[in-house]
Structures are given as structure tokens and as C-alpha cells.
Amino acid sequence: ISALRSIEGISWKKFFDSTSTVEKKLQTDPHGTYTKMDFKSKDYYRHSIEKLARKFQVDEITLTEKALYLATRAKEEGKRAYRTHVGYYLIDDGIKDLSNELNLHVKANNKFSEGLYITINIVCTIIIVSAILAFSYVLGARFSTGQLIVAALLMIVPANEIVVALINWSVSKLKPIRHVPKLDLSEGIPENKKTIIVIPAILPNAKRTEELMKQLEVSYLGNKDKNLYFALLGDFKDSKVEKTSDEEEIIEAGFKEALRMNNKYFNGEKHFFFLSRKKIYNPKEGVYMGKERKRGKLMEFMNLLRGEENHTFSVMSSYIGTLKDIKYIITLDADTFMPRDSAIKLVGAM
């Protein structure tokens, strides 16, 4: 009974890490990333080694050593950083290099050929259209050449939709799902990976501005971290004049919400921001509007973070100097909420 209790108390993750020869070798990854990854990602690498070892008919240790050799050689030769990570040769395009190093020259990737996808798509669409026309002929329908061409053209889109749906379903069932490796950020986002979550949106009125700021608040409540920041990037609605009477009310609403949340959750420290851009006259549209819409907001926000002056942000709720070290930007649509703990997972994957 005592022995059973002792077994129950063992951390099998730690036990495996301390006894697995493959695990110990992987920890010498030249890129230094493997030891920083979460357990699920490490486990994905180990399972990939098992599958490749069976496919190549070599033992797991030999395969791991070859992958490490390729990563080390890439580092010594000054190749791009991702090629110095052992994972590149276990789950990515480097599998081909690994098979060549083992003198196997086996095509070992699980990628669905783009050319094959297009070919199947076209052939199946033609078959469906032809089958429908043939069936119509059997039932007694008679068409002129022109009518056949028109009928075929009209059926191409719906037939192709059916084919695409069937191909996507088949691929999802036949091909293994590829896990996206992630860093272990269970202790929080580090200082060198500061991230900001932004919502680029058009602000028609003060009420909508408050709603979007509160949406950022909900995202924060499910993703609390000292190195996570939040911002609403707003454009005023298009108008025939450069400024409208309701813009000041919108700005006031954004400022008020940013101040409220910073005081409530961070004792005044700036983690929530409201920014809006001045409108630029667009001669093609004949109105004043935000430059390049959503794309423009994001591009100019990145310029702003880099300290550049080529942007049209004219209103900021507070000094953005605290954002100069931001490394990642996560963009949410105006109707999207950030799921609980998903921000940390995304940062770990990036």
C-alpha cells in the first residue's frame, strides 16, 4: 500500500525528463529553445521522433543525434536562426534534410501539395458538372451548344463549393493535425516579449467607444499579465467635413474608460490606451476618412511604436513611452473577445 501511495505521488513528467536519453539529448538544442518549451510541445517533438524513427527504420537516439548535428552545423555555418533549432528537422521542412543525412532520401513531410489540391479541385468540379448535364440528358432534357455552355458556367461555382468542402473535410480526417510548438510561459510573459492587444475600429459615437473599451477590459480579465497592454485604435466615421461635433464626445468617452481601468486594475499605471486618428480627405471618395482604414491604423500604430512620425494619430489617452519595448501586437476584430489565457499561448507560439 505504501508503495502504491509513493507511485501515485511521483511526477511522471519529471521522472520521464530525468530518465529519457532522447529528452536529455534534445535539451542540448543549439538554438536553446527546446528547454523553454511547454510540456505539450516537447511531447509533440518526442512523438515525432517516434514516428520518424519507425518510418526511417532507425533508432530514436540515432535520429535525434542526426537532427542535433544538422542544427549545430547550421549554427556554425551562420544560417538563419530557425535552422539552428532541432525542431526544424523533426516537424518542419528540415525533415527532408534529416532523411538525406541518414542516406534515405525519403519524402517525409505531411504537406498536402498545392498542385495536387488544385488538380483535384478542377477535376472533381468538371466531373460534377458533367454528371449533372449527363443526368439531365438521360431525363430527356435537350440543350443547344450555347445553352450547355451557359448551364456549365452557372454550375461551376456551386459545384466547386461542394468539392472544396469535401476536400477540406477529407484532408482534416486523413492528415494529422500539426501542433504549433509554444514556449512555456506559465510564469507569465517575460519583459523581452511585451505584447499589446489592439482593437482597430471605426467609432460612430461615444456609446460604441465605451463598449469597445469595456471589451478590452473583458480581454484583460481573462488574460492578466503585467507585460500585457491594451489599446483601442479608433477612426471617426467618414464625413464631408474634417471635424464633426460628436468627435470630442467620443474622445472624452475613450479617455474616461482608459483612466478608469488604469486606476482600477493598475493603480494608475498605464496599461489601457485610447488612440484616434485625424481624418484625411480622400478625393476618390469625396469624404474625410481614416487613412487606409483598418490596415492604415495598424501600420501607423507600428510606426508610432517605433518612434516614427509618419502617422496620423492625433489623440492619445496618455504618453505611450511605456510601449516602446512592445515586441508583439495581437489584433482583435471589433466583434471578437480574447478567450481566457489565450494571449499567453499566442505569445508562446510567436
List where the protein language model places each region.
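Internal catalytic domains of large membrane-associated glycosyltransferases
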Residues: 1-50, 54-110, 178-350
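Alpha-helical bilayer-embedded segments of polytopic membrane proteins, i.e.
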Residues: 110-168
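Juxtamembrane/interface segments at transmembrane-helix termini
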Residues: 137-143, 162-184, 210, 234
